[in-house]
Each structure stands twice: as C-alpha cells, then as structure tokens.
C-alpha cells in the first residue's frame, strides 16, 4: 500500500511543501525567517482573535475595553502583550527576510519577490490600522496625520480622505472600519503567503552561493524541520522575554492616555518599524513630494530585480557590493533613529542626507558596483 502521505489529496500538498520538499543542502540560518514569519502570523491571528472577543470598536469604549482585557480577562494582559510585541517580532523577521533576499539575490525569483513586496505592504497596512484600535492619543493623532497624507493627491485628495474617515474627522466610523480592516487583512495575508509559497516551490529555494543547487538537494524533513524548530524556540524566547519583562518598551507613553481630539500630541511618532519610512516622508518639505518618497521607499523593492547588473547572483563573493549593502543597512538604522527625533536641526539635515543616500545606494551605487565587479573578473591579458 502506498504511503497515505503521498496519495491523499490534501496531505500530499503538505508533504510536497514541508516533508519531501527538496531543499539545498547549504542554506544557512538566514533561510529560517520564512518559517518564523509563518509562526508570527499564526501567533498574531490567534492572539488577535481572542482580543477581538473582548474588544469594542467604539470611540467611547475602545480604550476602556483594552484596559478591561488587561485587568479582567483571564490572561488578557498576556494575550495583549504577545499581540503588541508579536507585531514587532513580525517586522523584525520581515526586515531580516527582505535583507536576506537582497543580499543573496533571491529577488531574481521575480514572481516570489513581487508577491513578497505586496505582502510587506499588506502587513504594514494591517499594523497601521491595528495601532489605531486602542484609541489612545498616539492612535488618534497617528490615524489623523497618516490618513491626511492622501489629501496631497491632486484634485481627489480631500474627497478621498473624508471617504476613508467616513466623516469630516477621524471618529467612530473610522474606528469601526479600521477594526473591520484589521480583522480581515490577516486572512488576506494568509492567502498571499500561500501564493508566495506556490511560486517559491516552482523554482525551489535559492542558497548562499547563488549557484544552481539542483545537484545537491536534501529532504526538508528532518533536516530543516529541526533547524526551523530551533528558530521557533529562539524567537519565542525573545518574544516572551519582551512580553513578560518589558511589554511597553517599544510602545509610546502617549498611548496610555485616551484619545482627545482637542489636545494635540507634542510629537507624532509611529511604531519603530515605520520610522525609517516616516523619516523619508518628513525629509521632503513638500507634502506631495514626501508622500511620493514614502511610497517609493517601499515600492523601490519592486525594481531591484531590474537593477541587478552582476554576473553573480549572490553578494557572497562580491566585497564591493557587500560593503554597499552594509552601508545601506546602517543607513536604514540611521533613518529609523531620525524618524523618532523631533523636527529640528541637526536631525533634519541628517534625515535628508540619509534619505538621498538610501535611494542613491539602491538605484545608482549598487548597480554600478555590480558592473565594476564584472569588469574586475574579466581576464586582462
């Protein structure tokens, strides 16, 4: 009798994806982040579901309902802390996953890469609408400021903003629809993840060398199931440490005050994972220009496959491009820091230099480095 694992219509899909999947024998720990993101998504959906059972999407009771979850619901404080800090873990894994893709040339699997960029945008949208739900000061003013950016769109901008708000300001209608979006988007993300995996399994995984690994493949189970399990445990350790010892470390103190539309927050500051994009937005004094730069900072990922000039796929054997990659990493860390600072000198000029450097590195310097490395590899005699 043939193994059920290989014949059952449903089980064989799981088998081809997680058990008998041929995987390169040399993929490093940088390839763990895909499965870690899957784990993060499951954690977020489960904790979110339990929070939604007790949360009320109403301007009068939203803040109190979150306090009620933390005080009166069994382990409500833990569920909320896991959900809030789980978002930070999600983005940490996302950034490392994207960074891995850029470093090792995984973006040359164009369909997988493009779906990945769409996933990144969807997760960012989910996190933004989710941040509004506790209805604290930063929730309210964050929602007001970020949705207001759409008013920079010529002609239809103001109409669009009021349509999203459901009125003439961020109010009950806005909160209700943001809760609806926050509930539905993770399921859309799950569907996109399946498409992402579908395209990935058409080509198979890339590997650190960037060379075709077909001649040396090993089964996913037990090798990478064990390796992923170690990654899960380490991630869970970090998440639990964060949620249990310093749950509010990454949050904003302003969000402990209920939203007051009459009192303006002294500084509008998104969560840490949006600060790099926020810094790019603020570095341009023109509203429409800032919005376009904000969009470009993420959408630039879509053109990275077109900017690949090297004859080699990975950066593993390309020291000049490696140097530029780590400069880009330092640049993004600088932007993240600047995004959290007030709009005054010297932060303004640092932000502007870092923003220009970000686009310059990706669009000009890295493609040029690829061409130069090609030239250096050619025999000169």
UniProtKB/Swiss-Prot annotation:
Which species is this UniProt entry from?
Answer: Osphranter rufus
Annotated positions binding heme b b562 = 83, 182
Annotated binding of heme b b566, by residue: 97, 196
Name of the protein described by the UniProt record: Cytochrome b
Q: Does the keyword DNA-binding apply?
A: no
Note on how the cofactor is bound: Binds 2 heme b groups non-covalently.
Q: Which InterPro entries match?
A: Cyt_b/b6_C, Cyt_b/b6_C_sf, Cyt_b/b6_N, Cytb/b6-like_sf, Cytochrome_b, Cytochrome_b_C_euk/bac, Cytochrome_b_N_euk/bac, Di-haem_cyt_TM
Give the multimer and partner information: The cytochrome bc1 complex contains 11 subunits: 3 respiratory subunits (MT-CYB, CYC1 and UQCRFS1), 2 core proteins (UQCRC1 and UQCRC2) and 6 low-molecular weight proteins (UQCRH/QCR6, UQCRB/QCR7, UQCRQ/QCR8, UQCR10/QCR9, UQCR11/QCR10 and a cleavage product of UQCRFS1). This cytochrome bc1 complex then forms a dimer.
